[in-house]
Every structure is written in structure tokens, then in C-alpha cells.
Swiss-Prot record:
Nucleolar component of the spliceosomal ribonucleoprotein complexes. GO terms for biological process: mRNA processing; RNA splicing. Keywords: Acetylation, Isopeptide bond, mRNA processing, mRNA splicing, Nucleus, Phosphoprotein, Repeat, RNA-binding, Spliceosome, Ubl conjugation. One of its GO terms (cellular component) is nucleolus. The lineage of its organism: Eukaryota, Metazoa, Chordata, Craniata, Vertebrata. Residues 84-110, 195-320, 587-716 are annotated as: Disordered. The gene is Rbm28. The keyword Nucleus applies. This is RNA-binding protein 28.
Length: 750
């Protein structure tokens, strides 16, 4: 409980624990309170500790409490937390002893881990030279160059760093580098017993048993230098190369970890580290814990070499997994310590133990841990708080999101490890065609206008007809929105869609376009909206959440004009043609010399973006449907909600294949059982005209249209003829000046 314990200093010798508790209980409930006394007396040593249950009480105590019985006192947040021990030991023991002992134990373990072996070392190199080289990577605590009894060097050395991170940097930086004219090999130093095991494994004809353990548990922390110093002393000066080969046998099987944790030694006995080798299950999301067993007793039991290996395997260890109190933590930082993890978990209840899983060879953290609570309720609280749907977004430690699951037995963990998670292989995503489906007669259809229901039925019929073509697939990220008001533009629609996904993080809309009528539109004028639009999201989860919130929502545009939202249908062939067209245009742009370089760069950037959009659309069909958040938009009007379930179908030949989730089996209005006997009054419809009547009407219309056309043509020709006659008259007889032409007499009448 970091930050919940206060250190109270400058207390008078007469101070008692009950007085201190009475003072601090005025601020809030005190979980623990005691003063540190002198040995053999009740006189206070001048300081004490107070632990609260809530952080708010700690802040109040720091501000309000400044005196104790008239004396001024110092109240600060305690730096170190006392270990969980019984109440009697807390009251009687000295407060400094529980701090010093764990530090001493941890320091030893850390020292042994952050130790490197340097092989192929030059005889001219001294300890000071080595220290000067490795000081660049961190604090060097010790440099040891083993020597023979006659004082000659053996050709290798050990370098001890302060922590594991610095040792890892030195291993990366100094490996295969020259020191005093000789290329050195740097690796992790390994314990003596593991060195022996590696030697036996590398020897020909010797089979290494998996259950082999050291005979004496007290020799576990010994290092390779002990084995090397016990080797034959009658070797020559140039025999250090052979020694390097012996050392390399232990360096090869060791996997290098960047970081590790310091392993605490809790009083409760826990199983040996090598029992957790297969515990980190990445895909199964589960874990196992084989119970609590005393490590020393297990090591002593294995000293008996007469017991066959088969009997050892059959021996079942006691397990506490069935109690439901043990949890398995994954995604743990390699720097996280058991004490810090315990402080995070202790807010849910008292802990029995916390154990970080270490690698059996390097003794570095594997990034996972086990923790057992005293009660099952505390474990359930921890699981609930660790879920991503919790208020705080789960549990975090050292900047990493912790994944917490209930521990399972070793057998169940083996089954989970071998069990393959079958991923859906469908490429058309037909199951998404059902998303948002609303049938007449369902609860979601209540209050929907008849015009909207007619539109939905028409769109559903068109969707079924299009999906009969194998080249058409349902997009996972692109939405098609119908029944939009004419006044809605791109910006307003984008804003509404972002509001629909306000609970999600990192929502990005790649495209949001309202389709418009572009006929007869010139300049900057926008055409009239066609009442539908397309919106493409970056992630399927965000598109699904927006659909479930937006579809049939009466609060957006009113109950009489509800939006109709569905996943868009894409044509694989058209997307390929579009991609080829973009590639051709890019090639043309590259081939043409452009004077203005910035404009060219801008165009290329724009084309690259378009190409990425098209590629993402084409790859969309092959993506496996992701996990959907069922809580998104779970309202009465949102319509049918799909689940990306993977079902198996057994074929006649005995083989199994994935069941393809097809389109909805039921269409049209839903007729409930209670309404089956009732006769519904259908709206009166006009009788459809017969085929003969239709033909007669068409002929009449055609004849009525053709008659005026013929008359118009005849009138035109007659007018043209009259015009020509008039022109000839004017040429022959002269222009008429408004007076009627006089009839001229013939020549023979004179």
C-alpha cells in the first residue's frame, strides 16, 4: 500500500501506540498504528508508523496533525512498507529489523544475477583495465580474474554490476570487442550446478534428465568461478583456450533477458521456479499454479537417488487452484518487483504470497507472476478491476497494463497450450450483413414509420441480390447511411459519427462523404444531397459501435426520419481497377518533369494516401472479423446484433470445416405466435390492368402523340411552298406596295 503509511518523528519518550492511534483516528479510520520502543523497555525511540485505509485520510493527516501532547512532530509518507507479518510480531519486534533483512537477501540475489563472464581474455589485461572498460556501461562492484596456484591467469574474468540493466548494456556493448589486442566474448555468468548440467548434456552418449536437481540446495547460488577454480591446476599457460570452450558450453543455452526482478523470499512455501517454465500462455489467456510446496523439502526429497524417475513424476503436489484464490498475472515488466506488485494487489484484500516467475537458467523474470489471496472474494475483486471495461481501465504497474486471470492446474494449462484457437477464415464477412437488421413486428420496429420500413425492406432485397455475386463482400470498416435529411453535409455527419463513438479511444474516420447530384452544377455550387452517405473508419470496433448507436436512432433526426445504417457492400473487381488506375496516374506523375517541386510532393503525398485507402479496402475482405464489444449500443431500437462466432460443421466424410455464417434465414415482417390466427386488414390496392388493356393504352398514346407530329410536318411544308410562290411573284410582277395588283390586258386586246 504505497503512500498509505505515515512516518511520525520527534515523538516524546512517553508516547504510546494507543495515544498515537487516538490522535490519528480523528482524521479517518486507522488500519495499523504503533510506536517503535527501546529493547527491554516501553520507552519510545522517538518515531512510529501509522497506516490508513484511504489515501484521502493520509493527505488530511499530513496537513492537519502537527503536534502530539503539545510537542511538535514530523509527519511524512513512509518510504518503505513493513512486511506482512502477524500482529504480535508487529508490536513486539524492532521496526528496523524487517527492513534490513529483506534488503540483505535481495542484494545477494541481485548481485548473482548482474554478473558477467569475460572469456578469451588477454594475459596482459589486469583488473583495473577491465574495470575501466566496463565502467562506461554502469557501476562495477567487483572484478575477479581467477588465477592458478602458481599465480598465472586462467584467461577469463568475472565482472559484477550493480543492477541487471547495466549488465545487459555491458553484454551488448562489450561482446566481440577488443581488450588489450584480443577479442573477448561476454556472456552471463551461470551457477555451478547449471554449468555441470550443461557439461553432462554436451558430453556424447550422456542423456540429460529433465528432473535433475542439485543434491544440496545451499549450493544453488554458487557461480562458475568455483567450478573453474577446482579444475586441474597442472595446465599450461596457453590452455586458457580449452577453458574458454568449457565455459562456452554454458553460455550457449542461456537466453539473454534485458531485465529481471529481484526475487523475494516469502514465509509461505511456494513451488520451485522450474515448475513455472510453461506458465506464460500468450494465446490461451490462462495460467496454472501447482500449489505451495517447500523448496527445501523438495530438494531434500530429490537427494534420494534410489527413487525412480517415474515415481517422482506420479507424485502429485498439493494445489490451491481449486479454491479460486490464486490469480495469474501476465504482461509484467521485467523491472517489476514482488513488493511493488503486492502493493498494487493488496487494495483488494490480504495476500498470502506473491511470486514472480523466473527463468530456470538465467533467473530473470519471465514477465508473469502468481498471487494468492486469503479470500476468494478478494480474488474476484482483483479480476473485476483488471478487466479493460473497468472504470480505471484495468490495473497498471510500471507503465504496463496487467492481464489477470484465475490460475488453473498444470494439466489444464497443458491442454490450453496445445489447443489451437481456430480463427475464422471467411473472406466475404457475410455475417455482418445481418448487423442492424430490423424486421416488422419486432421490438426495434416499434414507432418506425411505414415509409422507413418500406425503405428497409427494399434495401434488404437489393443487398440479397447483390451478395449472390461472389465478387461482392461486406466491408468491416465502411458504413452506408441512408435516409439522411437533405440539409446534412459532410462536417455535420462526421461530428455525429464521432459523438456516437465518444466512449472509444483513438477513433479515426478516414472518409465521410454525403453523395450529391452533380448534374448541371458549375463552379463552387454544391449539388443537392441524394439522402445517403458513406463513412469509413480505421478500426472495425469503432465502425460497429457507430452503427449500433446511429442505426434507427430516433434522437438524431427525429422519430419520423430514422437513419438506416449498414455495412457497405464492396466489389472486389472495381477496387482492383481503381487501384490500377491510381498506380498508372502515379507513374505518369513521376515521368512528367514538374517545375514546382513542392506541388509535386503534395500531389504524391495525396496519391499515397489514396493508394493506402484503396489497399486497406481490398485487404478488408481478407481480415478475420475481430472481437466485437457486445456492450456497444445495446438499445431497444438498434436492431439485430451479430456475433463473430466460429462454428464447425461435420462433413459426410468425417472432416470438419468452418461454418459460413450466411445471410438471415428469415425476411419480411415477423409474425408472432399470438397473431397467427388473426386476419389482418390489408390496404386496398387497385387491380392491376391486364396485358391486353396495357397494349391498347400504349397504342392509343402512341397514335395520339404521332398525329400532331404529322400535322406539324404538313403545315411546315405548305408554308414553305407558299413562301417560294410569293418570292417568284415578286420577281416577275414587282413588289406589291400594299395595293391590289391590277390585271394587265393582253397584247391582242389593244
Amino acid at each position: 500500500m504505497a503512500g498509505l503509511t505515515l512516518f511520525v518523528g520527534r515523538l516524546p519518550p512517553s508516547a504510546r501506540s494507543d495515544q498515537l492511534e487516538e490522535l490519528f483516528s480523528q482524521v479517518g479510520p486507522v488500519k495499523q498504528c504503533f510506536v517503535v520502543t527501546e529493547k527491554g523497555s516501553k520507552a519510545c525511540r522517538g518515531f512510529g508508523y501509522v497506516t490508513f485505509s484511504m489515501l484521502e485520510d493520509v493527505q488530511r493527516a499530513l496537513k492537519e496533525i502537527t503536534t502530539f501532547e503539545g510537542c511538535k512532530i514530523d509527519v511524512t509518507v513512509a518510504k518503505k512498507k513493513l512486511r506482512n507479518k502477524s500482529k504480535e510480531t508487529r508490536k513486539n519486534e524492532n521496526a528496523e529489523s524487517p527492513k534490513k533483512e529483506p534488503k540483505h537477501k535481495k542484494a545477494k540475489v541481485a548481485d548473482k544475477k548482474a554478473r558477467l563472464i569475460i572469456r578469451n581474455l588477454s594475459f596482459k589485461c589486469s583488473e583495473d583495465d577491465l574495470k575501466a572498460v566496463f565502467t562506461h556501461y554502469g557501476t562495477v562492484l567487483e572484478v575477479n580474474i581467477p588465477k592458478k596456484p602458481d599465480g598465472k591467469m586462467r584467461g577469463f574474468a568475472f565482472v559484477q554490476f550493480k543492477n541487471l540493466l547495466e549488465a545487459g548494456k555491458a553484454l551488448k556493448g562489450a561482446n566481440m570487442k577488443e581488450i588489450k589486442g584480443r577479442t573477448v566474448a561476454v556472456d552471463w555468468a551461470v551457477a555451478k550446478d547449471k554449468y555441470k548440467d550443461a557439461q553432462h548434456a554436451s558430453a556424447p552418449g550422456v542423456k540429460k534428465s529433465s528432473d535433475r536437481k542439485p543434491k544440496e540446495s545451499g549450493k544453488k547460488n554458487c557461480r562458475v568461478e568455483e567450478q573453474v577454480e577446482d579444475s586441474d591446476d597442472e595446465e599450461d599457460d596457453d590452455s586458457h583456450d580449452d577453458e574458454e570452450e568449457r565455459e562456452s558450453t554454458i553460455a550457449s543455452p542461456v537466453s539473454v533477458h534485458k531485465r529481471a526482478v529481484k526475487r523475494a523470499a516469502p514465509e509461505e512455501s511456494i513451488e520451485e521456479d522450474d515448475s513455472y517454465e510453461d506458465s506464460d500462455l500468450e494465446e490461451g489467456g490462462s495460467s496454472y499454479d501447482e500449489g505451495t510446496v517447500d523448496s527445501e523439502s523438495s530438494a531434500e526429497d530429490q537427494e534420494d537417488e534410489d527413487v525412480p524417475v517415474s515415481e517422482k513424476k506420479k507424485r502429485k503436489l498439493p494445489s490451491d487452484v481449486t479454491e479460486g484464490k490464486t490469480v495469474f498475472i501476465r504482461n509484467l515488466s521485467f523491472d517489476s518487483e514482488e513488493e511493488a506488485l503486492g502493493e498494487v494487489l493488496q487494495q483488494f484484500g490480504d495476500l498470502k504470497y506473491v511470486r514472480v516467475v523466473l527463468h530456470p537458467d538465467t533467473e530473470h523474470s519471465k514477465g508473469c507472476a502468481f498471487a494468492q489471496f486469503m479470500t476468494q472474494e478478494a480474488a474476484q475483486k482483483c479480476l473485476a478491476a483488471a478487466s479493460l471495461e473497468a472504470e480505471g481501465g484495468g490495473l497498471k504497474l510500471d507503465g504496463r497494463q496487467l492481464k489477470v486471470d484465475l490460475a488453473v492446474t498444470r494439466d489444464e494449462a497443458a491442454k490450453l497450450q496445445t489447443k489451437k484457437v481456430k480463427k475464422p477464415t471467411g473472406t466475404r464477412n457475410l455475417y455482418l450483413a445481418r448487423e442492424g437488421l430490423i424486421r416488422a413486428g419486432t421490438k426495434a420496429a416499434e414507432g418506425v414509420s411505414a415509409a422507413d420500413m418500406a425503405k428497409r425492406e427494399r434495401f434488404e432485397l437489393l443487398k440479397h441480390q447483390k451478395l449472390k455475386n461472389q465478387n461482392i463482400f461486406v466491408s468491416q470498416t465502411r458504413l452506408c447511411l441512408h435516409n439522411l435529411p437533405k440539409a446534412v453535409d459532410d462536417k455535420q455527419l462526421r461530428k455525429l459519427l464521432l459523438e456516437a463513438t465518444r466512449g472509444e479511444k483513438g477513433v479515426r474516420i478516414k472518409e465521410c462523404r454525403v453523395m450529391r447530384d452533380l448534374k448541371g452544377v458549375h463552379g463552387k455550387m454544391k449539388g443537392q444531397s441524394l439522402g445517403y452517405a458513406f463513412a469509413e473508419f480505421q478500426k472495425h470496433e469503432h465502425a460497429l459501435r457507430a452503427l449500433r448507436h446511429f442505426n434507427n436512432n430516433p434522437e438524431i433526426f427525429g422519430s419520423q426520419k430514422r437513419p438506416i445504417v449498414e455495412f457497405s457492400l464492396e466489389d472486389r473487381r472495381k477496387l482492383k481497377v481503381k487501384e490500377l488506375r491510381i498506380q498508372r496516374s502515379l507513374q505518369k506523375m513521376e515521368s512528367k518533369p514538374v517545375t514546382s517541386k513542392p506541388q509535386k510532393e503534395q500531389k504524391e503525398v495525396g496519391k499515397d494516401k489514396q493508394q493506402k485507402v484503396v489497399q486497406s479496402a481490398t485487404q478488408d475482405q481478407s481480415k478475420a472479423p475481430g472481437e466485437q464489444k457486445g456492450k456497444a449500443g445495446s438499445t431497444s431500437w438498434s436492431g439485430f446484433q451479430t456475433k463473430a462466432e466460429v462454428e464447425q460443421v461435420e462433413l459426410p466424410d468425417g472432416k470438419k470445416r468452418r461454418k459460413v455464417l450466411a445471410l438471415p434465414s428469415h425476411r419480411g415482417p415477423k409474425i408472432r405466435l399470438r397473431d397467427k390466427g388473426k386476419v389482418k386488414s390489408l390496404p386496398s390496392r387497385k387491380p392491376k390492368p391486364q396485358m391486353g388493356q396495357r397494349k391498347q393504352k400504349k397504342q392509343q398514346l402512341a397514335s395520339s402523340v404521332q398525329a400532331p407530329k404529322r400535322k406539324a410536318k404538313e403545315n411546315k411544308a405548305e408554308a414553305r411552298f407558299n413562301q417560294l410562290v410569293e418570292q417568284y411573284k415578286q420577281k416577275l410582277l414587282g413588289p406589291s406596295k400594299g395595293a391590289p395588283l391590277m390585271k394587265r390586258s393582253k397584247w391582242f386586246d389593244s
